[in-house]
From Swiss-Prot:
<keyword id="KW-0399">Innate immunity</keyword>
<dbReference type="GO" id="GO:0019814">
    <property type="term" value="C:immunoglobulin complex"/>
</dbReference>
<dbReference type="GO" id="GO:0002250">
    <property type="term" value="P:adaptive immune response"/>
</dbReference>
<keyword id="KW-1003">Cell membrane</keyword>
<dbReference type="InterPro" id="IPR036179">
    <property type="entry name" value="Ig-like_dom_sf"/>
</dbReference>
<keyword id="KW-0675">Receptor</keyword>
<dbReference type="GO" id="GO:0042101">
    <property type="term" value="C:T cell receptor complex"/>
</dbReference>
<comment type="function">
    <text>V region of the variable domain of T cell receptor (TR) delta chain that participates in the antigen recognition. Gamma-delta TRs recognize a variety of self and foreign non-peptide antigens frequently expressed at the epithelial boundaries between the host and external environment, including endogenous lipids presented by MH-like protein CD1D and phosphoantigens presented by butyrophilin-like molecule BTN3A1. Upon antigen recognition induces rapid, innate-like immune responses involved in pathogen clearance and tissue repair.</text>
</comment>
<dbReference type="InterPro" id="IPR013783">
    <property type="entry name" value="Ig-like_fold"/>
</dbReference>
<feature type="domain" description="Ig-like">
    <location>
        <begin position="22"/>
        <end position="115"/>
    </location>
</feature>
<keyword id="KW-0732">Signal</keyword>
<feature type="signal peptide">
    <location>
        <begin position="1"/>
        <end position="21"/>
    </location>
</feature>
<dbReference type="GO" id="GO:0045087">
    <property type="term" value="P:innate immune response"/>
</dbReference>
<protein>
    <recommendedName>
        <fullName>T cell receptor delta variable 1</fullName>
    </recommendedName>
</protein>
<keyword id="KW-0472">Membrane</keyword>
<keyword id="KW-1015">Disulfide bond</keyword>
<keyword id="KW-0391">Immunity</keyword>
Length: 115
């Protein structure tokens, strides 16, 4: 059945910190991809911080937040299992790629910026 072989990924973005100089945005609101394929979720940010981290989380239907991966501003591209990050500091862009998609990957994804 075609529907059961597709998953939906909803993208939402947030930031942490006390200053309005920190901002996280996205262009994708939802993505549908077949299982076993890969999907890339984009996150653009603005910050005045010299050193910072970008975190990716997945929110389950139960509203539970699951930490996926962290990217440091002075680190090489992060990778953890099926999750990998393409970090472009000069472009203020960080993209999360999820490989070998599974139906369990259907969720809302959050990109967060913190010190």
């Amino acid at each position: 059945m075609l529907f059961s072989s597709l998953l939906c990924v909803f993208v939402a973005f947030s930031y942490s910190g006390s200053s309005v100089a920190q901002k996280v945005t996205q262009a994708q609101s939802s993505v549908s991809m077949p299982v076993r394929k890969a999907v890339t979720l984009n996150c653009l940010y603005e910050t005045s911080w010299w050193s910072y981290y970008i975190f990716w989380y997945k929110q389950l239907p139960s509203k539970e937040m699951i930490f996926l991966i962290r990217q440091g501003s002075d680190e090489q591209n992060a990778k953890s299992g099926r999750y990998s990050v393409n970090f472009k500091k000069a472009a203020k862009s960080v993209a999360l790629t999820i490989s070998a998609l599974q139906l369990e990957d259907s969720a809302k994804y959050f990109c967060a910026l913190g010190e």
